[in-house]
Amino acid sequence: MINIDFDNIEQSQPTLYDTLASDVKFLNTPHFELPPNANPGDFLRETFDHPSAPKALEFAHGTTTLAFVYGGGIIVSVDSKSTQGPYVASRSVKKVIEITPTLLGTMAGGAADCSFWERELGRRCRLYELRNKELISVAAASKILANIVYSYKGYGLSMGTMITGWDKTGPQLYYVDNDGTRLHGQRFSCGSGSTYAYGVLDTGFKWDMNDEEAYELGRRAVYHATHRDAYSGGAINVYHVQKDGWKKISSDDCFKLYQKYYNIVPINKPAN
């Protein structure tokens, strides 16, 4: 009979397998400690929303982002203003997330939610491409993101994003929000200024317009939204997605575009 002294067993050094297993575990889906309520927003309103309580904390979001498909590819146009309620936090926020060299995503809603989950999507897309030795399709990438956010439905995520790119089926554009909604389409606009942007976009859209006309349409649509929407502004960034990937076209300050698009006439100018 063999007697083993378990109290004096020496700790072995971690092997290469243990190290790799630890790395793989680290790369798995991020896990968060969720609140013990099915819907934290409803719980807070039911618990604290009564006449004697101070005004409840309101998470107000504002932005203008749009994307559309035309004959020459896909145009993505966004503003760069970030607000915290009535306070302007920044005028130089990057609202286009460069997921992969062939995929772009936009952010509207909570900046942290959009940025974190779209970067997580980029990690998963790169792993897919390494394992399968082919580019991931836009449909698959958008489905991955929709499945991720759906698992957190009701837990306070705030996200409205457009996933766009060019794959084997051609230019593709999808809309995904924090409820797991996933829509495929040709033209989308998201954010508090989207109503104004849609008006300009739908009026000026032509499938066979050239690239410069498409850039100008995306720029004008977001600009007019920033002119009327208090929560949009800063610079207007325009991207062009083509078969060989995406490229950034321009970044124009809204104040300079105001001088370009509006012919300001003095009030006291005599009539002709």
UniProtKB/Swiss-Prot annotation:
The lineage of its organism: Eukaryota, Amoebozoa, Evosea, Eumycetozoa, Dictyostelia. Its EC number is 3.4.25.1. GO terms for molecular function: endopeptidase activity; threonine-type endopeptidase activity. The active site is at T63 (nucleophile). PANTHER family: METALLOPROTEASE TLDD, PROTEASOME SUBUNIT BETA. The keyword Transport does not apply. Its main location: cytoplasm. This is Proteasome subunit beta type-5. Keywords: Cytoplasm, Hydrolase, Nucleus, Protease, Proteasome, Threonine protease, Zymogen. The proteasome is a multicatalytic proteinase complex which is characterized by its ability to cleave peptides with Arg, Phe, Tyr, Leu, and Glu adjacent to the leaving group at neutral or slightly basic pH. The proteasome has an ATP-dependent proteolytic activity. GO terms for cellular component: cytoplasm; cytosol; nucleus; proteasome core complex, beta-subunit complex. Transmembrane segments: none annotated. It is an enzyme of class 3 (hydrolase). The 26S proteasome consists of a 20S proteasome core and two 19S regulatory subunits. The 20S proteasome core is composed of 28 subunits that are arranged in four stacked rings, resulting in a barrel-shaped structure. The two end rings are each formed by seven alpha subunits, and the two central rings are each formed by seven beta subunits. The catalytic chamber with the active sites is on the inside of the barrel. GO terms for biological process: proteasomal protein catabolic process; proteasome-mediated ubiquitin-dependent protein catabolic process. It comes from the Eukaryota. SUPFAM superfamilies: N-terminal nucleophile aminohydrolases (Ntn hydrolases). InterPro entries: Ntn_hydrolases_N (IPR029055), Pept_T1A_subB (IPR000243), Proteasome_sua/b (IPR001353), Proteasome_suB-type (IPR023333). It holds the Pfam family Proteasome. It catalyses: Cleavage of peptide bonds with very broad specificity. It is found in: Cytoplasm; Nucleus. Residues 1-62 form a propeptide.
